[in-house]
């Protein structure tokens, strides 16, 4: 009996697909066939011995597959699922499974023979559910169920992870974990208002819901922070990655016909906080991006509370800095603001000597000191979380981490961050992006990062100028001897040489000329302008000056550049200036590529 599938189970499911998509369907046992990964989920064919149907498991069950609990050719019982059309193929269906349990491990082969009725398993649902909208659920709990609620018999509450744009009606039970302000907008179609809320269900899954105009005015006062609601009659679409604030592929829109009812007079729930941790050594790719990140680390130090004056209203707000480290042997400074600085920040200061592990959700990544993290209004800090990641991190720190030499993640990026407000690992573009957009930098300079090779350095160009040793400004030869600095209004007997040169760079998409000044040019050439001038003055069979320039070519660098417009003979031209130069960190480059691949997979 245990090694049997439900006879005609798939046919039964398909025969009842006209039921409301949120209805409780019969539990059936199927065989898992052709199990394979698809992004962060797994797909397979559900087999009942006679028929097959394509199916998808949620990401929450990936751990069961990795551990071997769910196996290819094994049997599973489908507890909660929906049947949907494959877009563009109305004749084909697929099952989106939200809850299942393993029945048997892998069988010797795929079940193909027709199964006798006596061996089938047709399980009835364990519970009977009453079909109802959000308002009807509340009315029933208050003892005044509407007639429509008594007529329908199968509606249930959906977990957020099960929602998709192809479903019909659904009802969710969620807590408001963040509420935005009412904003106004103006476009070609007129004026309007909009606001957003972030909703979290009992499993910790989050989704952003947006309301416009009439819906915004209707629900703005109804939604209150921290309260739990039943919501139905909304719509879903793919989330706009540029504006989304939570980890969900979809976003929700509520209109004036949507139903939102507070779940009062019943047992409440506290959502489980789900984290998607980013290792500290990978934070550079998120600098000044819209993405909010989660981080976990061991507390290295905690500063006293300081007061910072806010620019927009001159109000003094509390701030506290903490330094975190993780197994990548990198550290990062996290700024706690407002109540987090004075509340949980004080707790961390009191226990700093014990080096607790903390997990922080929803952090903004900035470019101060190369890379830094800051809390925002929706940030959540958990001290010594009960999680495998925290246990592993604490064990590493106690065993070896506390004796390990650490370095700040932003130490190699600070110069670039100070000259363009971004790190070397954000705003990465190919040269063709710049050369094919001649209008870049018309209004103000724009900044990019690019990886390119030095392909040519013109040897007969003016590569340096005479500079004052005090202020680095240009000097002129004095009438009698020495050099005169107009800026310092003084004469010196000696001056220094400082680079001002042009270099041609190339990548796989094209080439262009960059202007490089002293500090950046020294990193490119590998010596000071004074040293290069000495080589140029030397005589001998080997031209050391030319050799030095050749050594500098066909070497790869990470460049932080600014693009501006310069007028020459009444014609505007692009001027591309080097603001920072760094050697290639191949480990960081590999992580960047892997992250891009992961993002592309997620978007597909």
From Swiss-Prot:
One of its GO terms (cellular component) is nucleus. InterPro entries: Euk_RPA1_DBD_C, NA-bd_OB-fold, Rep_factor-A_C, Rep_factor-A_N, REPA_OB_2, Rfa1, RFA1B/D_OB_1st. A zinc finger (C4-type) spans 468-488. The keyword Membrane does not apply. SUPFAM superfamilies: Nucleic acid-binding proteins. GO terms for biological process: DNA recombination; DNA repair; DNA replication; response to UV-B. Disruption phenotype: No visible phenotype under normal growth conditions, but mutant plants have increased sensitivity to genotoxic stresses and agents that damage DNA bases (UV and methyl methanesulfonate, MMS). Disulfide bonds: none annotated. It is found in: Nucleus. Heterotrimer of RPA1, RPA2 and RPA3 (canonical replication protein A complex). Component of the replication protein A complex (RPA) required for DNA recombination, repair and replication. The activity of RPA is mediated by single-stranded DNA binding and protein interactions. Probably involved in repair of double-strand DNA breaks (DSBs) induced by genotoxic stresses. Belongs to the replication factor A protein 1 family. This is Replication protein A 70 kDa DNA-binding subunit B. It comes from Arabidopsis thaliana (Mouse-ear cress). The lineage of its organism: Eukaryota, Viridiplantae, Streptophyta, Embryophyta, Tracheophyta. The gene is RPA1B.
């Amino acid at each position: 009996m245990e090694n049997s599938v439900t006879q005609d189970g798939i046919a039964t499911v398909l025969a009842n697909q006209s039921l409301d998509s949120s209805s409780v369907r019969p539990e059936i046992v199927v065989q898992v066939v052709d199990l394979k990964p698809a992004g962060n989920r797994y797909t397979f064919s559900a087999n009942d011995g006679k028929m097959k149907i394509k199916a998808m498991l949620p990401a929450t069950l990936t751990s069961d597959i990795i551990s071997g609990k769910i196996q290819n050719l094994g049997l599973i019982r489908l507890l909660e699922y929906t049947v949907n059309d494959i877009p563009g193929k109305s004749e084909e269906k697929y099952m989106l499974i939200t809850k299942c349990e393993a029945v048997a491990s892998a069988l010797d082969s795929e079940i193909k023979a027709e199964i006798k009725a006596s061996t089938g398993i047709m399980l009835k649902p364990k519970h009977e559910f009453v079909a109802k909208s959000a308002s009807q659920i509340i009315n029933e709990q208050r003892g005044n169920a509407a007639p429509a609620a008594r007529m329908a018999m199968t509606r249930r509450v959906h977990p957020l992870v099960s929602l998709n744009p192809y479903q019909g009606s659904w009802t969710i039970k969620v807590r408001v974990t963040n509420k935005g302000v009412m904003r106004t907008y103006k476009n070609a179609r007129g004026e309007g208002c909009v606001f957003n809320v972030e909703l979290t269900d009992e499993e910790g899954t989050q989704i952003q819901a947006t309301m416009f105009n009439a819906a915004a005015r209707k629900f703005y006062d109804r939604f209150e922070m921290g309260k739990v609601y039943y919501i139905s009659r909304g719509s879903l679409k793919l989330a706009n990655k540029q504006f989304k604030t939570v980890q969900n592929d979809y976003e929700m829109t509520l209109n004036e016909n949507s139903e939102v009812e507070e779940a009062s007079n019943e047992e409440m729930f506290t959502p489980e906080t789900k984290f998607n941790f980013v290792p500290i050594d990978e934070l550079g790719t998120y600098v000044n991006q819209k993405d909010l990140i989660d981080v976990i680390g061991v507390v290295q130090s905690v500063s006293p509370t300081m007061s910072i004056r806010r620019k927009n209203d001159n109000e003094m707000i509390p701030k506290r800095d903490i330094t975190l480290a993780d197994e990548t042997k990198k550290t990062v400074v996290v700024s706690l603001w407002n109540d987090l600085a004075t509340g949980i920040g004080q707790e961390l200061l009191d226990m700093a000597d014990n080096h607790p592990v903390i997990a922080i959700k929803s952090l903004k990544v900035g470019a101060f000191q190369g890379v830094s993290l800051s809390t925002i209004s929706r940030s959540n800090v958990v001290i010594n979380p009960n999680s495998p990641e925290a246990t592993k991190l604490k064990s590493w720190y106690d065993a070896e981490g506390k004796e390990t030499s650490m370095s700040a993640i932003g130490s190699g990026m600070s110069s670039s961050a100070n000259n363009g407000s971004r790190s070397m690992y954000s705003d990465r573009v190919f040269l063709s992006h710049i050369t094919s957009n001649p209008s870049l930098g018309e209004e103000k300079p724009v900044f990019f990062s690019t990886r390119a090779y030095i392909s040519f350095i013109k040897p007969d160009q003016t590569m340096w100028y005479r500079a004052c040793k005090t202020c680095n400004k240009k000097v002129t030869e004095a009438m009698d001897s020495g050099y005169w600095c107009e800026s310092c209004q003084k004469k010196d007997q000696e001056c220094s040489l400082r680079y001002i040169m042009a270099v041609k760079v190339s990548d796989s998409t094209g080439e262009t000329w960059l202007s490089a000044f002293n500090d950046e040019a020294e990193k490119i050439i590998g010596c000071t302008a004074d040293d290069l001038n000495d080589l140029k003055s030397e005589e001998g069979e080997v031209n050391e000056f030319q050799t030095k320039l050749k050594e500098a070519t066909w070497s790869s660098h990470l460049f932080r550049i600014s693009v501006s417009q310069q007028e020459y003979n009444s014609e505007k031209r692009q001027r591309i200036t080097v603001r920072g130069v760094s050697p290639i960190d191949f480990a960081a480059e590999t992580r960047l590529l892997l992250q891009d691949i992961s993002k592309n997979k997620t978007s597909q």
